[in-house]
C-alpha cells in the first residue's frame, strides 16, 4: 500500500470530484478513497504509473465483494457438478429401475449391504488397487441391488460408473464394423467402475464369447476395477467348461473378490407383496 502523501491526496481528491458512488459506497475522509459501507474495506487503490511520473486510482474489490464472488463461483461449480452427475447417471444407469437401487431404499434385511457401504467408503483405495467384486449366488438374493447401490453412491460423488450387461453390450455390437467394435469396447475405459450384471445369462456362441473376452480383457488391461454379478456358482467359475470361458473367468477371479449371496429370495418376496397388493386392488369394493 502506497503511503498517501499530500501530493497523492490532492490527486485523489481531484479524481473523487467526478466519481459516481454506488449505494453501498462512501469516500473515506481519512484517505479520500472509495470504501464499502458494509465491511469498510477499500474499493479503490493508488497505483504508480509505470514509465512516467504520476499515479492513478483504479477500482478494486473489498472483502465482502470477494466473498460474494467466491460464493457465486461456488454456486456455479455446484450447478455444473449437479448437471455433470445427472449426465453421468443418464449414461451410466441405462435402465431406469436402477435409479431406485440406493442405500436409502435398503430395507436392512441383507447383512451383506454393509460390504457395499464399505466399498463406497474405501473407493479411492479400491480404485488405486484395482479391487473389484464378484457377487455370486442364487436368483433374487440382492446381487444387482448391492451393485446398483454402489453405482448410485459413486455417481453421486461424481465418479464415472457404467452398469450394464452382456446382452445389452452384444446387441450394441451387432452390425458394427471391427474398428467400431474396438472403439466401443475401448469406451468402457472412460468409466472408473464398470459393473457387468448377470454374467452367464447371455448365449454362449463363439461370437458372443469372443466379444465378452474382449470386454473383460480390455478392462483387465486398463487396470480399472469392475464388479460382476452372476447366478453361476463359484465352482463353475473356477472349473469352466472350455477354454473360451476359462479366459474370461480367470481374469474376473484375479481382479474381483468373491462375495456369496445365499440369503432369501428378495425378488420372490417382493413379487408376493405385489400379488397381494394387486389382489387387494381388484377385490376392493367401491361405493
Predicted regions and their residues:
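Walker A/P-loop nucleotide-binding motif
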Residues: 127-147
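Short glycine-rich substrate-engagement loop in P-loop NTPases that contacts/grips substrate
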Residues: 111-120, 128, 151-191, 203-210
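Loop/turn-to-beta-strand initiation segments
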Residues: 159-160, 190-193, 222-228
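Hydrophobic/aromatic beta-strand patches that form the interior of the parallel beta-sheet core
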Residues: 133, 162, 195, 227, ...
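A short, basic N-terminal segment
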Residues: 1-107, 269-287
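Pre-Walker A (pre-P-loop) alpha-helix and adjacent loop at the N terminus of AAA/AAA+ ATPase modules
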Residues: 91-133
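Walker B catalytic acidic pair
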Residues: 198-199
Amino acid at each position: 500500500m502506497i503511503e498517501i502523501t499530500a501530493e497523492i491526496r490532492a490527486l485523489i481528491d481531484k479524481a473523487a470530484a467526478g466519481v459516481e458512488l454506488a449505494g453501498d459506497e462512501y469516500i473515506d475522509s481519512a484517505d479520500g478513497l472509495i470504501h464499502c459501507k458494509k465491511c469498510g474495506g477499500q474499493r479503490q487503490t493508488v497505483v504508480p504509473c509505470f514509465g512516467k511520473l504520476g499515479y492513478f486510482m483504479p477500482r478494486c474489490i473489498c472483502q465482502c465483494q470477494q466473498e460474494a464472488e467466491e460464493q457465486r463461483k461456488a454456486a456455479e461449480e455446484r450447478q455444473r457438478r449437479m448437471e455433470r452427475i445427472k449426465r453421468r447417471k443418464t449414461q451410466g444407469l441405462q435402465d431406469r429401475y436402477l435409479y431406485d437401487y440406493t442405500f436409502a431404499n435398503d430395507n436392512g434385511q441383507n447383512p451383506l449391504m454393509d460390504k457395499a457401504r464399505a466399498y463406497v467408503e474405501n473407493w479411492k483405495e479400491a480404485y488405486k488397487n484395482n479391487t473389484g467384486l464378484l457377487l455370486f449366488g442364487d436368483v433374487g438374493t440382492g446381487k444387482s441391488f448391492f451393485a446398483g447401490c454402489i453405482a448410485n453412491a459413486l455417481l453421486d460423488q461424481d465418479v464415472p460408473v457404467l452398469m450394464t450387461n452382456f446382452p445389452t453390450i452384444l446387441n450394441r455390437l451387432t452390425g458394427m464394423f471391427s474398428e467400431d467394435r474396438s472403439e466401443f469396447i475401448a469406451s468402457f475405459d472412460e468409466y472408473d467402475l464398470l459393473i457387468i450384471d448377470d454374467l452367464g445369462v447371455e448365449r454362449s456362441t463363439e461370437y458372443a464369447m469372443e466379444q465378452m473376452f474382449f470386454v473383460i480383457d480390455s478392462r483387465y488391461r486398463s487396470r480399472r476395477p469392475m464388479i460382476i454379478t452372476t447366478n453361476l456358482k463359484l465352482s463353475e467359475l473356477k472349473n469352466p467348461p472350455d477354454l473360451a470361458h476359462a479366459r474370461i473367468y480367470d481374469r474376473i477371479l484375479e481382479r474381483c473378490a468373491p462375495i456369496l449371496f445365499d440369503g432369501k429370495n428378495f425378488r420372490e418376496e417382493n413379487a408376493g407383496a405385489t400379488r397381494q397388493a394387486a389382489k387387494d386392488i381388484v377385490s376392493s369394493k367401491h361405493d
